[in-house]
Structure formats: C-alpha cells, structure tokens
C-alpha cells in the first residue's frame, strides 16, 4: 500500500495542532506540527502513539511500514526524512520516546 493510501486508513488529526516527542527524562526532543509537508508524519506518529502509548521499537517498526515507499527513500537519503530517520534511531538504540499531543 502506498503512503497516500495508508494515510486514508489512519485516524483524523484535525483535532491536533502538533505532537511532541519526549526523551526518557520528559524533555521535548522534537515537535511535529499539523501543517503542509508534516501532516502525514503527524498522522503516522499520532496513530502509533494511540496504538502503543509511546514510540518504542515495536511502534517504530510499524511506523516504517506505514511510511511505505518513503522508508526506502529515507534509507537511501539520510536526513531527507527526519521523522523516518528518528524511527530508525529508535530501532537501533532501543530508546523509548514519550508522546504529548497538542490540541488545535
């Protein structure tokens, strides 16, 4: 399934302004805003957070599947897709990221 098709299956994110990712100490390490060019990543991360309660290795693996064709592009072009790169990092390090949603 393509990323565009996958997005159609994910819960709506109209109620979200952003999502923050937190390190193990609770500090914000990233913010994904609900704006053009980022809304797809927000939808993926919000769905992962709803299913897993956090972004851990299992959630990151699922996220790479959800990002579909963009995952291969991210592997070939490190830095081009920072929200996918972050999932690779979680898998490699075994880290767990907390998630805080910001209402619209």
Identify the role of each PLM range.
Residues 15-17, 58-59, 71:
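A generic short-segment signal for beta-strand/edge and adjacent turn/coil regions
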Residues 20-57:
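Amphipathic alpha-helical interaction modules
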Residues 8, 35-38, 80:
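Context-gated lysine
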Residues 7-10, 59, 66:
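Generic hydrophobic, helix-prone segments enriched in Leu/Val/Ile
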Residues 61-104:
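Short, compact, well-ordered microdomains
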Residues 10, 48-55, 71, 91-94:
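Generic structural signal for hydrophobic core residues of well-folded globular domains
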Residues 4-27:
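Short, charge-rich, low-complexity alpha-helical interaction segments
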């Amino acid at each position: 399934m393509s990323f565009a098709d996958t997005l159609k299956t994910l819960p709506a994110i109209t109620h979200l302004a952003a999502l923050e990712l937190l390190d193990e100490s609770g500090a914000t390490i990233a913010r994904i805003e609900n704006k053009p060019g980022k809304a797809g990543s927000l939808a993926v991360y919000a769905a992962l957070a709803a299913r897993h309660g956090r972004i851990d290795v299992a959630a990151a693996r699922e996220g790479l599947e959800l990002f579909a064709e963009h995952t291969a592009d991210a592997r070939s072009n490190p830095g081009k897709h920072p929200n996918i790169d972050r999932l690779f990092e979680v898998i490699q390090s075994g880290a767990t990221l907390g998630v805080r949603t910001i209402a619209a």
